């Protein structure tokens, strides 16, 4: 048996931690899941010391397509053994890593709080390896969140590579949009410096947020919507007010991609 690819992470997890990412996936990728033939398989890669996120992913994806199946993959055998009592129809757990040892090519791979523990120069190769495992029309979602899921940033990738970056937050916890910088995924977190696109984006977002201060009397949601609407004049956003109301904003990857060098 080949050794799994990758190294064990800290395994930190909490119930409902990935709710923002899950809801976005069900919305953005739901149509592709429903078109999948055979039934779509989703992978929760590196689910951690307890299986909560895989259990929740199955429940949320089945609101988009009741045929969905979820495979939780962990590189630590003890974590797989601890998760097995939670197996049920549509939910299994498997020992593995970035090779993604599933019989079928997944329609979705979710890797949350995994690559944050790797070096930046390792990210591109891991992305490429995971994207190579996707089914046609599949999606890789890779990102980072805080311990209870209030702040989250992720990259969505297709078989061809990165497509978008999504920022999502519990608006009541936010002082300014750049607070999300500490949750940038590994490909971007060290690029939040002057001269880099992601730094310019967060700078402009903070300025739009400050300009929208009069809307704070209507609530944090209305202030966020106004700030994002203003931001859309200068940055290629891919979503609309329905998602902004959820405390989200999604930007084309090309606009935030790291500068060369």
Residue ranges and their predicted role:
Residues 1-40, 44, 49-51:
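Class I SAM-dependent methyltransferase Rossmann-like catalytic core
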Residues 37-39, 67, 105-106, 137:
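A general structural motif
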Residues 43, 48-101:
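Class I SAM-dependent methyltransferase SAM/SAH-binding core
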Residues 106-124:
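A short SAM/SAH-binding and catalytic strip from SAM-dependent methyltransferases
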Residues 116, 124-136:
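A short glycine-rich, Lys/Arg-flanked "PGG" loop and its adjoining helix->strand segment in the class I
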Residues 134-149:
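Conserved beta-strand signature within the Rossmann-like core of class I S-adenosyl-L-methionine
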Residues 153-223:
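A conserved mid-domain beta-alpha-beta active-site/ligand-binding segment of alpha/beta enzyme cores
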Residues 199-261:
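Conserved Class I S-adenosyl-L-methionine
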């Amino acid at each position: 048996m080949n050794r799994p690819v990758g190294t064990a992470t800290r395994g930190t997890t909490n119930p409902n931690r990935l709710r923002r990412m899950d809801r976005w996936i069900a919305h953005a990728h739901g149509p592709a899941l429903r078109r999948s033939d055979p039934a779509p398989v989703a992978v929760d890669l590196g689910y951690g010391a307890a299986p909560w996120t895989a259990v929740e992913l199955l429940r949320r994806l089945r609101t988009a397509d009741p045929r969905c199946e979820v495979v939780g993959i962990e590189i630590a055998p003890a974590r797989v053994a601890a998760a097995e009592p939670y197996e049920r129809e549509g939910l299994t757990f498997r020992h593995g890593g970035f090779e993604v040892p599933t019989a079928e090519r997944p329609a979705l791979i979710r890797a949350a709080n995994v690559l944050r523990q790797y070096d930046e120069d390792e990210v591109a190769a891991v992305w490429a390896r995971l994207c190579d495992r996707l089914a046609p029309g599949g999606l890789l979602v890779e990102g980072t969140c805080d311990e209870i899921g209030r702040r989250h940033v992720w990259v969505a990738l297709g078989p061809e590579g990165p497509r978008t970056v999504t920022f999502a937050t519990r608006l009541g916890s936010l002082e300014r949009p750049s607070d999300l910088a500490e949750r940038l995924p590994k490909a971007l977190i060290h690029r939040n410096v002057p001269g880099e696109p992601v730094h310019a984006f967060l700078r402009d977002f903070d300025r739009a947020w400050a300009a929208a201060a009069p809307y704070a009397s209507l609530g944090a949601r209305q202030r966020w919507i106004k700030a994002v609407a203003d931001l859309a004049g200068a940055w290629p956003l891919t979503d609309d007010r329905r998602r902004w109301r959820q405390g989200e904003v999604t930007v084309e990857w090309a606009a935030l991609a790291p500068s060369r060098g």
